[in-house]
A protein has these predicted regions:
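N-terminal flexible/basic segments that precede or flank functional cores
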Residues: 1-47
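Short, charged recognition helix plus adjacent turn
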Residues: 9, 99-107
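Alpha-solenoid HEAT/Armadillo repeat architecture
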Residues: 34, 54, 77-80
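Short alpha-helical DNA-recognition segment
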Residues: 54-74
Length: 107
């Protein structure tokens, strides 16, 4: 019996395709930072947003967010330390928004 081979997609390529879907993006970013201390969560969140922007196209995200492309790259690089205003603009550019909820407390 002949083995059937299926074509596989490299993990990052598949992830970049998934990150074009706003519903997936919300789950991806929320899951990435859930339960982390603030110091870690902020770096991971910015890295995640940068990956989403890359997947959706930095030029397109820059145009939709009203942020110059060069400024977008600078803000989302490692240790870029973007302002809340910049993050809000980028999230607008990738088609999602921030929301808040009451923190669950341990009993």
């Amino acid at each position: 019996m002949k083995k059937r081979r299926t074509k596989s997609v490299p993990h990052e390529k598949g992830l970049l395709e998934d990150l074009k879907d706003p519903e997936f993006v919300v789950h991806f970013l929320s899951s990435a930072i859930e339960g982390l201390p603030a110091e870690e969560a902020s770096d991971i969140l910015v890295d995640g947003i940068a990956l989403v922007a890359k997947a959706q196209g930095m030029t397109r995200v820059a145009e939709r967010s009203g942020i110059m492309r060069e400024s977008l790259y600078r803000a989302l690089k490692k240790r870029g330390n973007p302002t809340l205003s910049t993050l809000h603009g980028v999230l607008e550019g990738i088609g999602i928004e921030m929301s808040f909820r009451v923190k669950k407390r341990a009993r």
